[in-house]
Amino acid sequence: MYNSWFVLKQKSNILLTILTSSLLAKFSYPSTLFFFLEMALMKVMTILVLFVSVSSTLAQSNNGGHISIIVSETGLEFAKDYLIKKVITTTLPLQLPDIENKVKIPLIGKVRMGLSNIQIDAVHVQSSKMETRKDGIILSVLGATANLSMDWSYTYRASFFEISDHGDASVEVKGMNVRITATLVNDNGSLKIASRENDCTVKNIDIHINGGASWLYQGVVDAFQKMIISTVEKTVSTKIVEKMKKLDSFLQSLPKQRKIDDSAAVNLTFTGNPVLGNSSVEVDINGLFMPKGDDIKVAGSRSSSFFGGVNKRMVTISVEEGVFNSATLVYFNAKVMHLVMEETKNGSILSTSDWKLILPELYKHYPDNKMVLNMSVTSPPAVKITENGIDATIQLDIAFDVQDSGENLSVARLSTILSVACSTEIVKNNLIGSLRLNDFNATMKWSKIGEFQTNYVQAATSRILEALFLPYVNTRLKRGFPLPIPGDFTIKNIKIVYVNSGILVCTDIGTSTNQ
């Protein structure tokens, strides 16, 4: 029976899972990469915190971020449009405070008027833009219109009688401009909105009274036009402040580490301040694996490398090969890179009879005995990423155990150094991977049943790797790892690019409603 080699409990860090799966790492599906992507999409503005800077060459950084994220100009455009839509849908209908006033009506006198149940029912954005400057990110909404509904009432008191009436009215707000400025800074490994400003102005309004005489209409206009404009401006500004405070709290509450399993966690602290470029936003994340329980080390500066664009996708996430190597080191030190196999891929029990042609000495001493293969990684696998893909070198010991008279006996052990390549693709929002054996070199470490001929050692190792090891790993990888994308979002036009010392995941983002 296949024992659990990888304990995959959570759906995250797809790229790390694929690679460390190929390296016999036993860990769950954390997502250093896509975990951030998921959190960003949960709160729209954090899309700006989530995208990676890229380059044809990824420089190594010792204390900076090992995962870099950038939002391109098209990514900012998407973030802007989604942000505006999200704010409108989650804010409306927006209730405004009641308004009362006294107005002098010609030939009638002073009339007490009141507006109640005032609310903004709809907002229509005509034009918008997002800018990145040294002093922050600026979101502007220009020339928007809004529809208001409200109830009106008036009371007129003469010497011996009182006249009153009520009804409803609608208001069209024209020329509404909103401007929001926010500055993101690093606060001990978390992101914080250091400063925020907003402004809302309204050019004019049109009021439509349902019922009432012409004097009433003119009275309402005279009494309330400026007050309605002022109320709309103040209420919208107040609501923006509330949402910015919630966003700030959310950013500071993002976890600084993510538990993977009982052996490891991922350092999720931000390194340095976000960099606002020409129509782009860049952040760095530490991203390294560490033993579970270790204290978080917060780096004081971001990576020194800036990356030139390699494609026009909205989002590009780059991961240095150091992230992968940190994973293999942590799991190797945790002593979990071990696999016990008692069955073949099709479920048949392993037996010495399967090896009588390849390892005749084994079959000669233990004919038709059940057997077990114990595989252990003997040093941290070394990962190397080039423009041609991901390669890894693994030092693996393979022990042959046989069951004889109810006892498990270790009868021989092979040592092999193998080179594997990992290829990846994305199918229906799932990341699919596969391993391919490039080369290997095997030697006999020790044997209790006599020395194996060199050609037998090579043949046995080849069979184990090709018929047992690789099919096992690839079966895991071909199940596909769902990318943690919330239901409102889809990823498309995905491209995986390998560069020197790093891997890039380039993608566009859309919503399920605009497919």
Swiss-Prot record:
Specify whether Glycoprotein is a keyword of the entry: yes
An annotated GO cellular component: extracellular space
Q: Which Pfam families match?
A: LBP_BPI_CETP (PF01273), LBP_BPI_CETP_C (PF02886)
Alphabetized InterPro entries for the sequence: Bactericidal_perm-incr_a/b_dom, BPI/LBP, BPI/LBP_pln, Lipid-bd_serum_glycop_C, Lipid-bd_serum_glycop_N
Q: Which UniProt keywords apply?
A: Glycoprotein, Signal
- The residues that carry sugar chains are N147, N188, N267, N278, N346, N374, N408, N441
Q: Is Signal one of the keywords UniProt gives this record?
A: yes
Provide the GO MF annotations for this entry. lipid binding
Region forming the signal peptide: 1-59
Family, per the entry? Belongs to the BPI/LBP/Plunc superfamily. BPI/LBP (TC 1.C.40) family.
The protein depicted here goes by the name: Putative BPI/LBP family protein At3g20270
